[in-house]
Amino acid sequence: MQCSWKAVLLLALASIAIQYTAIRTFTAKSFHTCPGLTDTGLAERLCEEGPTFSYNLSRKTHVLILATTRSGSSFVGQLFNQHMDVFYLFEPLYHVQNTLIPRFTQGKSPADRRVMLGASRDLLRSLYDCDLYFLENYIKPPPVNHTTNRVFRRGASRVLCSRPVCDPPGSSDLILEEGDCVRMCGLLNLTLAAEACRERSHVAIKTVRVPEVNDLRALVEDPRLNLKVIQLVRDPRGILASRSETFRDTYRLWRLWYGTGRKPYNLDVTQLTTVCEDFSSSVSTGLMRPSWLKGKYMLVRYEDLARNPMKKTEEIYEFLGIPLDSHVAHWIQNNTRGDPTLGKHKYSTVRNSAATAEKWRFRLSYDIVAFAQNACQQVLAQLGYKMANSEEELKNPAISLVEERDFRPFL
């Protein structure tokens, strides 16, 4: 019985590998996918009737927002979601993680990471080609007739909540809030969603489930995709404060430290150090400017975007070579100086952006900040975040902890 847990873990990892290999084998045979059908005759008949997806050979520009949790990625996602010619998807890789990685391993092992990244790259490649049927491999329970109510945060995508994908009662110009979308639109028809995707010139996807830009090299180098990466970073101290408030149970020991002034002996410091290590590795790659990232990579600090959202958004769109939509500018004006009471929801994007970027300084004790600074010293210097050398410096809003840096895109 002593080794029973090891046997369970090995069986789980073997199961993951088998699932992923099966999906890879299936999709390698054809770009035309009809997942989830066990009746051979029925599968052939439906495949003949369904739409055939071909890889995008045009020079459309597609976008990947590479971020980590609580770094401002939902805000950046909205800069693309509001564009009328962009098909935006919010965290589709959630489904890969939820399907392939056993909850009890938490996806921390190297084997888990390899499986997750391989499957993620395959799904991203398909989604950029508007092959939304491929997503069905990871939706549980499987969609019926390509319809489902299980797409993660479907309401965070404007296109998936408007005509022709959704036909809500009322005005055709009605813009649904996320909760209203799920309630009023009913099941998501992936065939209609794929059609809406193909009608637009660009696909933008946000993910917090790819650790480093190196993990995307195969996609960046694929000339059929013309993919550009926006890497969003934030002061790790701010990320820690935001996660502690949002994920109260997971970050309970950090909150206990804040409340008692004593560091718990069993504190999971990797909740902080993993962010810093991934940032450092990924940003180091980007700043070394390898040839495969030329014209493909832009580093954006959340703090710069929060302080001057319109200017930074214009820079982002200029890098991408996509005209800035007036709807995006209007959204920025309405959502970066908002009523603070509207931004209390943990996933809200309505807020005073400049104030939000600095709020962490009043939500962490100085001993926690000092610990974080010691653990993340390298990446803080790399990204231009200043050390707070005392409680007084930390709490004084007149003292900026963000250096003026000009992270120009690699063109």
Swiss-Prot record:
The keyword Transmembrane helix appears for this protein: yes
Tissue-by-tissue expression: Broadly expressed with highest levels in central nervous system. Expressed in cortex (at protein level). Expressed in high endothelial venules in peripheral lymph nodes, mesenteric lymph nodes and Peyer's patches.
UniProt binding sites for 3'-phosphoadenylyl sulfate: 69-75, 234-242
Pfam families on file: Sulfotransfer_1
Pathway involvement of the protein, from the record: Glycan metabolism
Topology feature Lumenal, residues: 24-411
Keywords: Carbohydrate metabolism, Glycoprotein, Golgi apparatus, Inflammatory response, Membrane, Signal-anchor, Transferase, Transmembrane, Transmembrane helix
Catalytically driven reaction(s): 3'-phosphoadenylyl sulfate + keratan = adenosine 3',5'-bisphosphate + keratan 6'-sulfate
Family under the similarity heading: Belongs to the sulfotransferase 1 family. Gal/GlcNAc/GalNAc subfamily.
Name of the featured protein: Carbohydrate sulfotransferase 1
Source organism of the structure: Mus musculus (Mouse)
